[in-house]
Regions:
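C-terminal terminal segments
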Residues: 48, 125, 208, 328, ...
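Glycine-rich, charged/polar anion/phosphate-binding loops
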Residues: 36-42, 139-142, 170-177, 243, ...
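Short, low-complexity N-terminal leaders and the immediately following helix N-cap/first helix
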Residues: 1-66, 95, 107, 331-355
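Short, surface-exposed secondary-structure edge patches
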Residues: 46-48, 82-87, 93, 144-147, ...
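Hydrophobic, low-charge alpha-helical segments
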Residues: 319-329
């Protein structure tokens, strides 16, 4: 099965968790909104200065020019958080800090570096007069009421992710709590008789430390889920059935297994899923990760990943990541995809899509450039991390999904 078709099968089999919970707004970063949030007030509520400078009546400086400077008296100072009590009189300016309210009568701000402070050598706090050599335009360098948010404006819609900008707006509006979708629970079941816990004091030469489960747990967290790590299950069909049933007792929204999903003599994971439920697909026309399967057991989706660390990571990103984001109620579940120019040729088997990690960077003249990463080259310092989709021998360009920002 093609991986795009596999994605469709998985997403069509899932329903968002649909359970909301209310969290304090400072804890909502990265969560998915379950309600529409409206701005309770204009932000800002009054005109504020965007810069450190001088509040001015634009009409007083309308004729200012380099050859015809306008001299105005400094009537005082006003800092951020201080109420403007006096009206700005014609022929005067008021030294203001960034975020300070504009006094009545002022309708513009001149940045201090664009004014000549008198007497010369004085600083802003001790200025007595200023010379303006360029006109002030009404509203210049001023935050007007509602510039950042207007009362009644939609700040968040259901399915929106609370990013830093949204969090800043919510906090600035004094919104104390937010209804968000519950994070999906993901049970992670590593399989393999050769595995020992990653932190085991000792591992025999014929054994392997189980790193997959820990890596997948971190990916689950990045995708917005809550990982539940389960004990290692051996390569035994009956034991795997029992391990799957015990995993379902933890009420996961998704069960992810690693290992035993191919066709080797000791690969029993897919068979155990078939014994207990339904296998919707097994085997993908991809490399790595041909031994990947998906099914349902007691209504719980089960994603069976390969046992290799890199293969498991890649297939989770391609299939598990969008599934988890869909379960979590996100509106957009797929990573952005671009067409990239390859810095070296890449080969792929006929009829198979090769999934290849790559480092990507933007070049103003050539567009996206992709450098394939090989087995031990995991990092992309200063560049995007991405995944190439090679559908045939590619010498020039290939599709790529963008993952980690530089």
């Amino acid at each position: 099965m093609h991986f795009d078709q596999a994605r469709h099968v998985i997403l069509a089999s899932l329903k968002p968790v649909g359970e909301a919970e209310r969290v304090p707004t400072p804890e909502a970063l990265g969560r998915v909104a379950a309600e529409e949030v409206l701005a309770p007030e204009d932000l800002p509520r009054i005109p504020l200065s965007r810069v450190d400078g001088f509040a001015v009546r634009s009409s007083d400086a309308a004729q200012a020019a380099p050859g015809h400077p306008v001299r105005l008296r400094v009537g005082g100072t006003l800092r951020a958080g201080e109420a403007a009590s006096a009206r700005l009189e014609p022929g005067t300016v008021l030294a203001v800090a960034t975020g300070a309210p504009l006094p009545a009568g002022a309708d513009a701000v001149i940045p201090w570096e664009e004014a000549v402070i008198l007497p010369r050598g004085s600083d802003v706090r001790s200025a007595q007069e200023v010379l303006l050599t360029c006109p002030a335009r009404p509203g210049g360098h001023v935050f007007q009421p509602g510039d950042q948010a207007r009362r009644g404006e939609v700040l968040l819609r259901p399915g929106d992710v609370v990013d830093l900008a949204a969090l800043d707006t919510l906090l600035s509006q004094g919104i104390a709590s937010l209804s968000v979708w519950r994070r999906p629970r993901v049970a992670i079941l590593p399989t393999g008789s050769e595995l020992v816990p990653w932190d085991a004091p000792e591992a025999a030469p014929h054994q392997a430390r189980c790193s997959n489960a820990v890596l997948l747990a971190r990916l689950v967290e990045q995708a917005g889920g809550v990982p539940v790590l389960l004990p290692i299950a051996p390569d035994d069909r009956g034991a795997l059935r029992q391990a799957i049933l015990q995993a379902l007792e933890r009420s996961p929204d998704l069960l992810v297994t690693t290992g035993g999903a191919s066709h080797g003599p000791f690969d029993f994971t897919v068979a155990a899923v078939a014994d207990l439920g339904e296998v919707l697909f097994a085997d993908l026309a991809v490399s790595p990760g041909q031994g990947t399967a998906f099914g349902l057991v007691q209504g719980v989706p089960v994603l069976c990943l390969p046992g290799g660390a890199l293969s498991a990571r890649i297939l989770f990103q391609v299939l598990g990541w969008p599934a988890l984001r869909h379960l979590g109620g996100r509106e957009h579940v797929l990573q952005p995809r671009v067409r990239a120019r390859l810095t070296e040729g890449v080969r792929a088997r006929p009829g198979t899509v090769r999934l290849l990690p790559a480092c990507l960077r933007w070049d103003d003249s050539a567009g996206w450039l992709a450098t394939p990463r090989h087995a031990r080259e995991f990092h992309c310092p200063g560049q995007w991390e991405g995944l190439l989709f090679i559908q045939q021998d590619a010498q020039e360009t290939a599709e790529a999904e963008l993952w980690e920002r530089p």
